[in-house]
Curated annotation (Swiss-Prot):
Disulfide bonds: none
Its EC number(s): 2.5.1.75
Protein name: tRNA dimethylallyltransferase
Gene Ontology biological process terms, A to Z: tRNA modification
Source taxonomy: Bacteria, Bacillati, Actinomycetota, Actinomycetes, Mycobacteriales
Subunit annotation: Monomer.
Pfam families in alphabetical order: IPPT
Keyword tags: ATP-binding, Magnesium, Nucleotide-binding, Transferase, tRNA processing
Cofactor: Mg(2+)
Keyword ATP-binding attributed: yes
Keyword ATP-binding belongs to the record: yes
Gene3D superfamilies per UniProt: 1.10.20.140, P-loop containing nucleotide triphosphate hydrolases
GO terms assigned for molecular function: ATP binding; tRNA dimethylallyltransferase activity
Binding sites annotated in the UniProt record for ATP: G8, P9, T10, G11, T12, G13, K14, S15
Length: 313
């Protein structure tokens, strides 16, 4: 069974579209969803990631949700291996795997079957120590000195990716980008659709989404996760919303002041997602505001299933 992938920026309605597809195919083909949102991998990180509740999943099986504790580090390599096994198992039992998410590296690693550069714990630890000593901005400048292209593609505030880039450069002797695959035929011949909205409309959706998270108890969720080790999490503690609430609580606030930084950070992240996904010529884009998106996706998937080429844009 050839999979379907629903990708695109945060807040565009990808999960709802996937559920609509499952309902439209009910009685014809069973559908199972494979999550491709890195922060939804974490148990207890529900409100701030807009994770569907069990009831909201409408009986559709979901995979790669709630598989990590907040103290564990999420890695693209681990996700790729586990999610690929899920896709293969779903297809083997005659169901349709629908990959849903907007975590850029996670999506592409799965669809392009990335092979990952070697890692060395000692080299990684040395660069992490260097990060702690000089700070993220200085380490970003050090990366720029040895790999300008990598530095240009990594945010100066993203210490984890800066460390990884420096580790790869040291271990391989090549630029970080040289380890990344090119975009080719998608794994499993997956049909890929992207969902997006006009910018001003999406910004308003993101504003409402952020407000809803805080009204539903994001601050209380973060407080509860602190007791489970959130501050010690390398990746979980940096998640949008969680990082901002943590910072406000640590500064003596009640968490409410994190609302605006969370919205601004989410909007900035959406711009990065758009830039990333728009370069992928394999994606067929849909307007989130348009009617009939479920039917449009199913037409594309049926064409791909029958072996027809992707229609020209």
């Amino acid at each position: 069974m050839r999979p379907l992938a629903v990708v695109g920026p945060t807040g565009t309605g990808k999960s709802d579209l996937a559920l609509g597809i499952a309902e439209a195919l009910s009685g014809e083909i069973a559908v199972e969803v494979v999550n491709a949102d890195a922060m939804q991998l974490y148990r207890g990180m529900d409100i701030g990631t807009a994770k569907l509740t069990v009831d909201e999943r409408r009986g559709v099986p979901h995979h790669q949700l709630d598989v990590l504790e907040v103290t564990e580090t999420a890695t693209v390599a681990r996700y790729q291996q586990a999610a690929a096994a899920d896709v293969d198992a779903i297809a083997a039992r005659g169901a349709l795997p629908v990959i849903v998410g907007g975590s850029m590296l996670y999506v592409q690693s799965l669809l392009d079957e990335w092979s990952f550069p070697a890692t060395d714990p000692q080299v990684r630890a040395r660069w992490e120590t260097r990060l702690a000593e000089v700070g993220v901005a200085a380490l970003h400048r050090e990366l720029a000195a040895v790999d300008a292209a990598a530095a240009a593609s990594i945010l100066p505030t993203d210490g984890r990716r800066i460390v990884r880039a420096l580790e790869v450069v040291e271990l391989t002797g090549r630029p970080f980008a040289a380890s990344a695959p090119t975009i080719g035929a998608p794994r499993w011949n997956t049909a890929i659709v992207g969902l997006d909205w006009e910018t001003t409309v999406l910004d308003e959706r993101l504003r409402r989404r952020t407000d809803t998270m805080f009204e539903r108890g994001l601050v209380e969720e973060v407080r509860g996760l602190i007791g489970r080790g959130l501050r010690d999490g390398v990746t979980a503690a940096r998640a949008l919303g969680y990082a901002q609430v943590l910072a406000d609580l640590d500064a003596g606030g009640d968490g409410e002041a994190a609302r605006e930084p969370t919205f601004v950070g989410t909007r900035r992240y959406v711009r990065r997602q758009r830039s990333w996904f728009r370069r992928d010529h394999r994606i067929t884009w849909l307007d989130g505001a348009a009617p009939g998106n479920v039917d449009a996706v199913l037409r594309l998937w049926r064409q791909r299933r029958a072996g027809a080429p992707r229609p020209a844009d």
